């Protein structure tokens, strides 16, 4: 379960059994096929997660998401790919937290932990610009409380990885 506290953000109150979560993604070092499966799974859920988050987002959470995005831009401007990767993970994790759904939050935590090295390699290979336009359009959708737009943008972002 997650809890939203005015002025401080959203917090995980209760976690689902670890054994349940471990069955979602293969344990151990991910092979290429595992990474493809995780990315495919994210493509299935990320757009709906974004739509749900838009519908539940508070002004404070929107401000937090915007602050994370500003840090993402700063990392890109400094060409700090390590920070860029970490902040990108934080951005997607924040969207999961905004849903106020503990299963979404924990699933994202698990999947993003596995994918963080892949995300870093993507930034090294393709450059720091890859996700930023999508993030900017997502924030616009959040500002407009437009779940359909958020779903479309996140779907395109997930497919573009």
Where are these regions (language model features)?
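Amphipathic alpha-helical interaction elements
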Residues: 54, 96-100, 120-123
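Amphipathic alpha-helical repeat elements characteristic of tetratricopeptide repeat
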Residues: 18, 32, 43, 63-66, ...
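Short, cationic motifs built from Arg/Lys/His that form the positively charged side of catalytic pockets
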Residues: 42, 46, 56-57, 92, ...
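Exposed, interaction-prone assembly regions rather than primary DNA-binding/catalytic cores
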Residues: 52-68, 72, 80-81
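C-terminal all-alpha effector/ligand-binding and dimerization domain
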Residues: 66-73, 78, 86-90, 106-161
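Short linear motifs at protein or domain termini
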Residues: 1-45, 51, 55
């Amino acid at each position: 379960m997650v809890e939203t506290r005015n002025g401080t953000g959203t917090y995980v109150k209760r976690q689902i059994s670890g054994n349940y979560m471990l069955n979602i993604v293969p344990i151990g070092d991910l092979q290429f096929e595992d990474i493809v499966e995780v990315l495919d799974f994210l493509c299935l859920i990320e757009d709906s997660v974004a739509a749900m988050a838009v519908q539940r987002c508070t002004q404070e959470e929107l401000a937090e998401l915007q602050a994370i995005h500003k840090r993402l831009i700063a990392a890109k401007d400094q060409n700090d790919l390590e920070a860029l990767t970490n902040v990108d993970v934080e951005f997607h994790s924040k969207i999961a937290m905004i849903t106020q759904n503990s299963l979404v939050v924990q699933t994202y935590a698990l999947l993003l932990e596995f994918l963080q090295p892949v995300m870093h390699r993507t930034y090294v290979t393709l450059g720091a610009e890859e996700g930023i336009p999508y993030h900017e359009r997502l924030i616009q959708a959040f500002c407009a409380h437009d779940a359909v737009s958020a779903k479309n943008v996140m779907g395109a972002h997930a497919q573009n990885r």
